[in-house]
Amino acid sequence: LRKIRKHITTIILAVMAVIAGVYAYNYHDMKQNIVYNEHLDDVAVTVNGKELTLRDMAFYVAFEEMNVEKQALVYDSGNPNKYWNIHTNGEFVRVTARKAAMSMAIHDEIFYEMAKKESITLTDDEKEALKNSEKDFWYDLSDIDGAKKLGVEKKDIYSSMEKSAIARKYQEIYAGLDNADITDYDFSGGRYEKLLEKNNYKIKEKVWKRVDMGNVTLDH
């Protein structure tokens, strides 16, 4: 009986060791930043059944990085990375930026799908304005070699920007129907938060948390 107990104890300890090893491996894997352009087909989030990959997220990552970098250069033009590492409101600026990029993508996906159901499209004037915005954004992105670092092509960025423009247009329509200001339905707006609760989304943390915001299109 003693031998049986000893054998069972050995088995239990072995199983626990395996579990601990798997946990340690997964934890280490979660802490490792990914090389963005090597993971473009990885799913970052699912919104109402629609999967958005890192390729789909590229525009939002670049947009947020460039916006925050402007603030970083004002804070310390000689060492902008210092700003990205500031800890404020309980988290680092780079973490806040990563969350903002994801929130914008989810927001646009929701409003874009709503727009499609209502057959909302851009007018010729809106398409022309979008075309100019796309060219400006691509120029700025290329200026920092961002597209190469992201691993995306012009069509990927333009597609996301068109989707965002349509989403924004429907956001304005939706806000008007609700007698609200368009900003109430921005991704941080109070009324949008209530709308968000009616939608299903799941962020793939094992992928998204490994995106090193501040160092994807930028070199710090």
How would you label these PLM feature ranges?
Residues 20-23, 104, 119-120:
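Alpha-helical transmembrane segments
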Residues 1-93, 190-220:
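Short, low-structural-confidence N-terminal segments
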Residues 103-116:
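Active-site SXXK
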Residues 66-97, 116-190:
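Charged, solvent-exposed helices and adjacent loops that form client-binding or oligomerization surfaces
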Residues 35, 100-101, 133:
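A generic secondary-structure micro-motif detector
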